[in-house]
Amino acid sequence: MSNILHRVGTLDEVASKAFRVRKTCNKMLLKRGFNIDEEDIDMTTEAFISRFGEKPSRETLTILAENKEDVSDRIFVFFPEEDKVGVKTIKMFTSRMQQENVKKAILVVKINLTPAMKSVIREMSTSDGNSFRLEYFKDSELLVDITEHTLVPEHIVLTPQEKKTLLGRYRLKQNQLPKIQLSDPVARYFGLIQKQVVKIIRVSETAGRYVTYRICV
């Protein structure tokens, strides 16, 4: 036990960041409705070192999860090793996705992607006949779980049926709903796509509990 504590005390900054980022990724997938082992959500630094080592390779941090409601809906989380991710790396990931019949992936990169690489990912995600959906986050965006911040209200993504029921109940057209941008940090956290609706629950000392809805644009 003392050896473990000693190693934790000397855990370098890179490994510490990897621990925090991977833990946030698991929490994010859980809140998106994917099955995540409880041990991954509650993982301690000691458990992380035991599983991945003191200087983990980013490749070993890869996550593969399936949706609680639809086991065919699976998602990868990849952690590229290189600082500047290129087309070769993206193609390596999409090749693995094809082999394992996985349509969604999140890339967790060390630094921001170049505009050219962002364009490549957009094209790969929207090309005719290509059903991949690729998202990306920087390490620095996942050091903490933004949904756990006291100023961020609870967000719940509505199913298509729940959205239909909402619009029918209030006799609304979807363009009459308040909007949330695709680029909004919380929208990105939940992996929202255009026209999805999110329910936002706020708690106020003066107004009590109140609910609003926003549509992703």
Task: List each model region and its residues.
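Long beta-strand-rich cores associated with HINT superfamily self-processing modules
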Residues: 153-158, 162, 166, 206-209
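Short, surface-exposed secondary-structure boundary micro-motifs
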Residues: 202-203
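Short, structured beta-strand/loop micro-motifs enriched in basic residues and often containing a Trp
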Residues: 173-184
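Short, compositionally biased
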Residues: 208-217
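Helix-rich terminal scaffold detector
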Residues: 1-103, 115, 119-131, 140-145, ...
